[in-house]
């Protein structure tokens, strides 16, 4: 019996993986048909990784990566929701992602406000490394207190930046930031994070190397603010933009 052409197989796989009704079970079954189907299906089966309250899930995926570390290269989207205490399995997963992944989208959040410095230093350094990967184009950070603003300076190819319920830690005075390319997002979405916006806008006077983020090429901006002071900070950001096409402001 003949086999289907590769382009037809790819079409079937993309069809199963597309849309909101992703057929995981069919993809899993298809990957077991023959060896050549494994990498084609893994591309979709492992494209998104959610780390959250289920320590059992983290343990299973950590063990899977230990046996098949090449799986990490299929992960494109990381959604990490902190549920302390963090397990060693979570750290193991981050370590493998650092070595083998080409993440494109990262979301860091917490079910309630969490202090950045509460996280183990090994987790902090791994997360900063990952968000600064040159392949990352979208970053979403929510519900974190004291996230270092300078960590954003190394996100060289960031296009879409989303910050919510976030309190950034400003750079230290005269702090030197080493980078090859300044962060220049095209889209910015901030809600209840105007203190963070102030830290980013004022950063140029605090350290050598210019501002942490260059907003001059911003094309889309959306803000949710709570006070007149917040609106003032948004106005300061608008002053440095030169390509803004879409702007939305919602006051609560």
Give short role names for the model-derived ranges:
Residues 2-92, 115-118:
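Hydrophobic regular-secondary-structure patch
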Residues 11, 244-248:
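C-terminal capping region of solenoid repeat domains
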Residues 14, 18, 39, 164-167, ...:
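Positions within ordered alpha-helical repeat solenoids
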Residues 47, 74-76, 186, 217, ...:
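A generic secondary-structure signal marking the coil-to-beta-strand transition
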Residues 55-63, 83-243:
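Leucine-rich repeat
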Residues 108, 249-251:
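A generic structural motif
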């Amino acid at each position: 019996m003949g086999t289907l052409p590769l382009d037809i197989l790819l079409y079937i796989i993309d069809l199963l993986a597309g849309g909101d009704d992703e057929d995981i079970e069919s993809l899993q079954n298809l990957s077991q048909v023959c060896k050549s189907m494994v990498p084609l299906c893994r591309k979709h089966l492992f494209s998104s990784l959610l780390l959250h309250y289920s320590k059992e899930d983290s343990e299973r995926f950590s063990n899977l990566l230990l046996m098949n570390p090449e799986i990490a290269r299929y992960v494109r989207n990381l959604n990490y929701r902190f549920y302390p205490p963090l397990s060693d399995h979570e750290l193991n997963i981050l370590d493998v992602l650092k070595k083998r992944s080409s993440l494109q989208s990262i979301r860091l959040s917490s079910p309630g406000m969490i202090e950045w410095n509460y996280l183990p230093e090994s987790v902090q350094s791994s997360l900063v490394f990952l968000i600064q990967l040159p392949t990352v184009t979208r970053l979403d950070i929510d519900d974190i207190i004291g996230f270092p603003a300078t960590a954003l300076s190394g996100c060289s190819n960031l296009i879409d930046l989303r910050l919510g319920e976030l309190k950034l830690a400003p750079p230290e005075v005269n702090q030197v930031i080493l980078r090859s390319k300044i962060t220049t997002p095209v889209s910015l979405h901030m809600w209840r994070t105007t203190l963070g916006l102030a830290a980013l806008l004022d950063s140029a006077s605090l350290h050598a190397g210019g501002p942490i983020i260059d907003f001059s090429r911003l094309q889309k901006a959306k803000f949710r603010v709570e006070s007149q002071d917040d609106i003032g900070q948004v106005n300061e950001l608008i002053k440095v933009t030169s390509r803004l096409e879409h702007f939305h402001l919602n006051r609560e």
